[in-house]
Swiss-Prot record:
Belongs to the NPR3 family. It comes from Aspergillus fumigatus (strain ATCC MYA-4609 / CBS 101355 / FGSC A1100 / Af293) (Neosartorya fumigata). Keywords: Meiosis, Signal. InterPro entries: HTH_NPRL3, Npr3. Residues 235-247 have a biased composition (Basic and acidic residues). GO terms for biological process: cellular response to amino acid starvation; meiotic cell cycle; negative regulation of TORC1 signaling; positive regulation of autophagy. Residues 62-73, 84-106, 677-693 have a biased composition (Low complexity). This is Nitrogen permease regulator 3. It comes from the Eukaryota. Residues 30-174, 222-272, 657-706, 749-768 are annotated as: Disordered. Mediates inactivation of the TORC1 complex in response to amino acid starvation. Required for meiotic nuclear division. The keyword Signal applies. The lineage of its organism: Eukaryota, Fungi, Dikarya, Ascomycota, Pezizomycotina. GO terms for cellular component: GATOR1 complex. The gene is npr3. Residues 43-52, 223-234 have a biased composition (Basic residues).
Length: 843
């Protein structure tokens, strides 16, 4: 698998709503009505999950797996169903529904293994529970040349004219899904209470069925009633649980906090940052009234719809059917589960607890389907009625259509609650696609939003970006500021005033910290508001635009849109150089962007042009990266010092032992023998101390002609070649000694220190240092600790002025002294002892 980051690919095939009452599980609604023909499915792939065997013996529902939050649990009824499926080997059937050209011919592999046969009596009975014996679907073997019409389950998908299949009673086409009768899915996708608020996942061939089942509490309620405490009143539902920074894992004992409002403190602010631009609040009193009257509302509606069916719902499960690629299975299923499945189910749980929403809508949908069955309504007509008359069916339809297109799904569940769901889009990539990778032209090409060792010392190259934006970033709006302000002000909501104020203060040339200092808005609030705008695709976080930075035409820009972009650019900047001319100028030798600005009067206008180019992915910032180079000379000096230390340590230990032996001998009875031994030993030590008679390994060698080839501390380190220190912030013991040796060689007085003083004694070294050249006159030993942490090859050197609060000219003078190579000619007198960096430039 390529390391290139990929944009969201929901792989969404269908959404299924399963409810369970005392009468048993029921497949209430699914969308689209015929996933095999109505979904734009990817072509058949040979690299489908090979771990799932293609013979009938291995055809079974994969073990329902839970994530870390779920632990291990299983459903005995599902196991029984799996054994039933396993008992039929090499069975075949044909799925109903036409598959258009270019779609997977295998129909997810279901037709290669399973043949469904309903009882001759007509419609199969719904089982009272998953483990009940009645209503079980029978499986049988079929020949390879068996007629498609023999399978009434398959034929039902094509019956939109009201005629019965194979002479049997009428079976509506909406009572089968993916070629299988509804009662099969009702049993399979209705788990036991052990799966309450856990990731429920079933794999069938190429498909993954993932849900977040919610069960009623033992006391008959859907939320745990909190104890009354005198606390600050909080908002009950602002869509906060729908945020991108929400914890993906639920606390096991969290019964009602999962959808019941924002957390306190900073976490609450960040959660609130992801509400929709038009949130509708539900007050606490309304929630209590709705929750208290939910039973009455449910009973009244049930009486109206079906006087004989007065049972209540005990479980609902919104199941998403996914078809992810083999190599991206875990990543794709996780992003859909974390961002869509779990949050949608939480919102439904909230409304179910408040107004009995899910059960009322399920009853309403069932009532409409029964009427359609009596009238033998066509499938398309029924679904038009359902989406028009049922808010839950319309919500499922909206989620499917929007998420399948990688768009934001704005779902109004009721007049009081409106939620927005999305899979956060990929806004940038640090990689250019390879020959076998799918290209995404126009995607912002940069490493600016990657986690670096300075931001997180424990992070590595493949760590995901931080959810909380760093204070040194700036905000680049992806739409016209006036248009965004109009939307915000028209939407109302808790965040609208703060968002409008921040948008008026924000500039792409100012970091969040600078905006906070100038506007008085707390930094945490700015980060929260910026995260809100970034998450909802209204803005992008970028390094602040500066005239001293260098920008180039992005290698990933989408030149196929040049003609359209040229017209839009001309409309925005009619009196300035055209888009092709700007791109041509930026394609030349890289130089600071300020060199393209004709005068100070054009500065703001040219910054607006640069923001426009960045917004469309036409240009990217060319940034500098550096690492510390260790020469063989440094390595040899450190190695000689290390070996000398070992010899000295050995000699000190020998002297200590000999002194102790001499002391013990003087106190003994045989003084003469001890005196001889002492004399002999002293003579030996004297010869060792002189280094003339006793040879020792690694003895003082001539530094001018060393014969060492590998380090004593690290036998894999060659002393005859140069090396780079990859991560100075976590250097090894040997690398630390190299760094100490490098610093010890820095001169005490820079060569140019005396040339940049003011006053009469400037030539003699007296007078004050000119602030303009302070970086050239300060000893490098004093500057080194501030800069070394950025020399890891991952942190851009352009970050240093912003993060350290230093002037850019000062920083670049220091970096030039250290060996940074730039395109500009430098008049700084360099000292070879300070030239320790190896630098590169890229995005």
């Amino acid at each position: 698998m390529s390391s290139i980051a990929r944009p969201p690919d929901p792989c969404l095939v269908a959404i299924i709503l399963i409810v369970r009452s005392r009468a048993g599980p029921r497949l209430v609604f699914h969308y689209p009505p015929n996933p095999l023909s109505e979904n734009g499915l990817r072509p058949a792939r040979k690299e489908r999950r090979t771990s799932r065997s293609k013979n009938g013996q291995d055809y079974k529902s994969n073990e329902s797996s839970s994530s870390e939050e779920s632990g291990s649990s299983s459903d005995d009824d599902e196991d029984e169903h799996q054994r039933q499926l396993q008992s039929q080997s090499q069975s075949q059937s044909h799925l109903s529904g036409s598959v258009v050209s270019g779609r997977r011919s295998s129909n997810f592999g279901l037709d290669d293994h399973v043949a469904m046969s309903v009882s001759p009596g007509g419609d199969s009975q719904r089982a009272g529970s998953m483990g009940s014996g009645s209503g079980r679907t029978s499986f049988r073997k079929r020949g390879g040349n068996s007629d498609v019409e023999e399978d009434s389950g398959a034929a039902s998908d094509r019956q939109e004219d009201g005629s019965g299949g194979a002479g049997g009673p009428y079976r509506p086409p909406w009572e089968s899904l993916l070629g299988l009768p509804a009662d099969v899915w009702e049993k399979l996708l209705s788990p036991s209470p052990a799966w309450h608020k856990r990731r429920f996942e079933v794999g069938i061939n190429d498909l993954a069925f993932i849900g977040w089942p919610v069960f009623v509490r033992e006391d008959g309620t859907w939320r745990k009633q909190r104890r009354k405490k005198k606390k600050k009143r909080r908002a009950d539902w602002e869509g906060g649980e729908l945020g991108h920074n929400e914890n993906a894992e639920d606390a096991p004992d969290d019964e009602d906090g999962d959808a019941g409002g924002n957390a306190s403190g900073g976490g609450g602010l960040m959660a609130a940052s992801t509400e929709t631009l038009s949130p509708k609040q539900v007050t606490l009193s309304e929630a209590k009234r709705g929750s208290g009257s939910s039973g009455k509302a449910a009973r009244s509606l049930v009486d109206c719809l079906d006087g004989d069916d007065k049972d209540s719902m005990t479980m609902f499960n919104v199941v998403f059917v996914l078809d992810p690629p083999l190599l991206e299975y875990s990543m794709r299923t996780k992003e859909v589960y974390d961002n869509i499945i779990k949050k949608f189910a939480k919102a439904l749980k909230w409304e179910q607890a408040r107004t009995d929403y899910v059960w009322r809508e399920a009853q309403h949908i069932s009532h409409l389907k029964e009427k359609a069955k009596e009238r033998r309504t066509s499938l398309n007509t029924l679904y038009t009625e359902l989406i028009t008359q049922s808010s839950l069916a319309r919500a499922i339809y909206t989620v499917h259509t929007s998420i399948s297109a990688s768009k934001i799904a704005s779902v109004p569940l009721s007049p009081d609650v409106s939620i927005s769901l999305q899979i956060p889009p990929l806004t940038s990539t640090p990689y250019l696609p390879g020959p076998t990778d799918k290209a995404y032209p126009g995607l912002w090409l940069t490493t600016a939003d990657s986690v670096t060792p300075v931001e997180d010392p424990t992070a590595d190259e493949y760590t995901a970006p931080h959810q909380v934006l760093a204070k040194h970033f700036a905000l680049l709006l992806l739409d016209n500021e006036a248009a965004i302000l109009r939307d915000v002000e028209a939407s109302g909501g808790a965040l609208a005033p703060a968002l409008a104020h921040y948008l008026r203060c924000s500039k792409p040339t100012k970091s969040f910290a600078q905006i906070s200092a100038s506007s008085g808005i707390p930094l945490s609030t700015i980060q929260m508001l910026a995260s809100h705008l970034v998450y909802w695709r209204r803005a992008r976080a970028i390094p602040p635009i500066h005239q001293r930075d260098t920008y180039i035409v992005s290698p990933n820009c989408d030149l196929s849109k040049l003609e359209v972009a040229t017209a839009a650019y001309q409309a925005a900047f009619p009196t300035l150089p055209s888009l092709p001319k700007m791109l041509s100028a930026l394609s030349g030798t890289p130089r600071p962007y300020g060199s393209f600005i004709p005068s100070k009067d054009h500065k703001e206008t040219y910054f607006a042009i640069l923001a426009w180019l960045l917004r469309g992915g036409w240009v990217t910032q060319l940034r500098s990266f550096a690492r510390v180079k260790v020469t063989p000379e440094i390595k040899m000096a450190v190695e000689v010092a290390l070996r000398r230390e070992e010899v000295d340590k050995y000699l000190r230990k020998g002297r200590s032992l000999e002194a102790q032996k001499s002391t013990d001998g003087e106190n003994g009875n045989e003084e003469d023998e001890n005196d001889d031994a002492s004399s002999s030993s002293s003579s030996s030590l004297a010869s060792q101390g002189s280094g003339e008679e006793t040879p020792m390994p690694g003895r003082y060698q001539q530094e001018s002609n060393p014969r060492l080839s590998h380090s004593m501390l690290d036998r894999n380190t060659s002393l005859r070649t140069s090396s780079l220190i990859l991560f100075p912030h976590r250097a090894s013991p040997l690398e630390s000694r190299w760094l100490e040796q490098i610093v010890s060689r820095f001169p005490e007085h820079p060569r140019s220190a005396g040339r940049h003083r003011r006053g009469e004694g400037s030539n003699a070294g007296g007078g004050e240092i000119d602030p303009e050249y302070a970086a050239l006159s300060t000893p490098m030993k004093d500057l080194w600790p501030t800069y070394i942490k950025y020399f890891n090859g991952l942190d851009a050197l352009e970050k240093i002025p912003v993060r350290e609060g230093l002037k850019r000219k000062f920083v670049w003078q220091v970096l030039t002294r250290l060996g940074l190579v730039t395109s500009q000619q430098s008049s700084i007198e360099l000292d070879p002892r300070e030239q320790v960096l190896v630098s590169v430039r890229h995005w």
